[in-house]
């Protein structure tokens, strides 16, 4: 679980997302409150529930990107889902309970990785001994039983030194490692994922505990044996319990496109993929118990962050009960031409940096002048105004159009230095930006 302060979280998000200070503050406070709650004593800790967030803003302004970056910072079980993928219980399609099942699977991977890292030192020692046993087989007594290994013999120490220095890396040995689980792909109708999971687990259990002889280089054998030994040091039942605790106490669910499940107009009848989904989401957000293959998971303290453009629907079109479960509302503002300029240059791995790095692989040095960046930003902003406003995603389209010729010829331009200035941008984009019909089809 992340122990970063709200200011540190916002500072980290600032490196990747331009503007949207209110949204960054809201998620930073929510993430910090997870840590604060865990510092409380038990009777009070249980009463403190997370304040779920609803992010409202046009497409392409950073809602999903905030979630993506938050997942990396949180160091907690995290899952992002599209609200449109689900249907009401009893109809064909995914049930909302599968969100918690997927979140628990994600927690299992996270906790397993943490446990492996904790035991890595011991696993490395044991893997080293197994490689040395293969290189220098221990003596057997008259009954064929292996005598106690002498780890301090001179020869063994010489081989240990060579092994640690990498002198034996390319030597081939034959080792016994755990056989991979049988991968059985079962195609089942939507909504029956739980049954397929149980069948897959059953087939995997049939093959667990079996070993397989493999011939490989010592350097690869060490990696395989370290993973093998680390897996043996992990208690599966303890792992499941830790994963369930991580989900219940620190889990975060990001529900995108929630505006697409709002009821439209005075439509009457079974609305299984809209209002029905909202009704099914209610118990999850409010707090219920979901049965997963790892055990029962309570959702009382899972943080839910929902987002939507709300261009056709409004937040008030959500059913009142769900509105009440999303008390924190954050509006993200539409991006200006100035924001586009900053997006092109300021974030880590900005778009201009990406294109420079891609062309550098061909030996072409690309330089974007300030006037070029300004013209690109203006072009993207104008096309957004004239046609559909898709936010920062328009920059990808404009940049691809701008770099089209250089990208095609780059393999024959090795060693050249290309300066992209305002005139170059006008020449490459001018006609398309000015002609509204062309903008519709090309940008």
Swiss-Prot record:
It comes from the Bacteria. One of its GO terms (biological process) is protein unfolding. ATP binds at residues 18, 60-65, 256, 321, 393. One of its GO terms (cellular component) is HslUV protease complex. Pfam families: AAA (PF00004), AAA_2 (PF07724), ClpB_D2-small (PF10431). The keyword ATP-binding applies. Keywords: ATP-binding, Chaperone, Cytoplasm, Nucleotide-binding, Stress response. Coiled coil: none annotated. It is found in: Cytoplasm. GO terms for molecular function: ATP binding; ATP hydrolysis activity; peptidase activity; proteasome-activating activity. CDD domains: RecA-like_HslU (cd19498). The keyword ATP-binding applies. Its main location: cytoplasm. A double ring-shaped homohexamer of HslV is capped on each side by a ring-shaped HslU homohexamer. The assembly of the HslU/HslV complex is dependent on binding of ATP. ATPase subunit of a proteasome-like degradation complex; this subunit has chaperone activity. The binding of ATP and its subsequent hydrolysis by HslU are essential for unfolding of protein substrates subsequently hydrolyzed by HslV. HslU recognizes the N-terminal part of its protein substrates and unfolds these before they are guided to HslV for hydrolysis. Belongs to the ClpX chaperone family. HslU subfamily. This is ATP-dependent protease ATPase subunit HslU. It comes from Histophilus somni (strain 2336) (Haemophilus somnus). The gene is hslU.
């Amino acid at each position: 679980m992340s122990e970063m302060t709200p200011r540190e979280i916002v500072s980290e998000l600032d490196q990747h997302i331009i503007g949207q200070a209110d949204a960054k503050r809201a998620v930073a406070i929510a993430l910090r409150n997870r840590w604060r709650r865990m510092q409380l004593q038990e009777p009070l800790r249980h009463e403190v529930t997370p304040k779920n967030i609803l992010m409202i803003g046009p497409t392409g302004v950073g809602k999903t990107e905030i979630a993506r970056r938050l997942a990396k910072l949180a160091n907690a079980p995290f899952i992002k889902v599209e609200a449109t993928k689900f249907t009401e219980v009893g109809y064909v399609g995914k049930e909302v309970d599968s969100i918690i099942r997927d979140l628990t699977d994600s927690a299992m991977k996270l906790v397993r990785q943490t446990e492996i890292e904790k035991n890595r030192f011991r696993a490395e020692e044991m893997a080293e001994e197994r490689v040395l046993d293969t290189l220098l087989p221990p003596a057997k007594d008259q009954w064929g039983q292996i005598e106690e290994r002498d780890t301090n013999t001179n020869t063994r120490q010489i081989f240990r030194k060579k092994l640690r220095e990498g002198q034996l890396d390319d030597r081939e040995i034959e080792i016994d490692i755990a056989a991979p689980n049988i991968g059985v792909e079962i195609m089942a109708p939507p909504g029956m994922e739980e049954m397929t999971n149980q069948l897959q687990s059953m087939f995997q259990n049939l093959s667990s505990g079996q070993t397989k002889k493999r011939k490989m280089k010592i350097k690869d054998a060490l990696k395989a044996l370290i993973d093998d030994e680390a897996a043996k040091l992990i208690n599966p039942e303890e792992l499941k319990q830790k994963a369930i605790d991580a989900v219940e106490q620190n889990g975060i669910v990001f529900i995108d496109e929630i505006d697409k499940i709002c009821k439209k107009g005075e439509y009457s009848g079974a609305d299984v993929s809209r209002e029905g989904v909202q009704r099914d989401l209610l118990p999850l957000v409010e707090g219920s118990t979901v049965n997963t293959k790892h055990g029962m998971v309570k959702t009382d303290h899972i943080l839910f962050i929902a987002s939507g453009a709300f261009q056709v629907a409004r937040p008030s079109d959500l059913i009142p009960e769900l509105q009440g479960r999303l008390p924190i509302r954050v509006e993200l503002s539409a991006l200006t031409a100035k924001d586009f300029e900053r997006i092109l240059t300021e974030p880590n791995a900005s778009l201009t940096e990406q294109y420079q790095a891609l062309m550098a692989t061909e030996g072409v040095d690309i330089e974007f002048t300030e006037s070029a960046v300004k013209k690109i930003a203006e072009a993207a902003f104008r096309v957004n105004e004239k046609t559909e406003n898709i936010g920062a995603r328009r920059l990808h389209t404009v940049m691809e159009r701008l770099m089209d010729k250089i990208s095609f010829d780059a393999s024959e331009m090795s060693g050249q230095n290309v300066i992209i200035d305002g005139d170059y941008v006008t020449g490459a984009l001018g006609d398309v930006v000015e002609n509204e019909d062309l903008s519709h089809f090309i940008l």
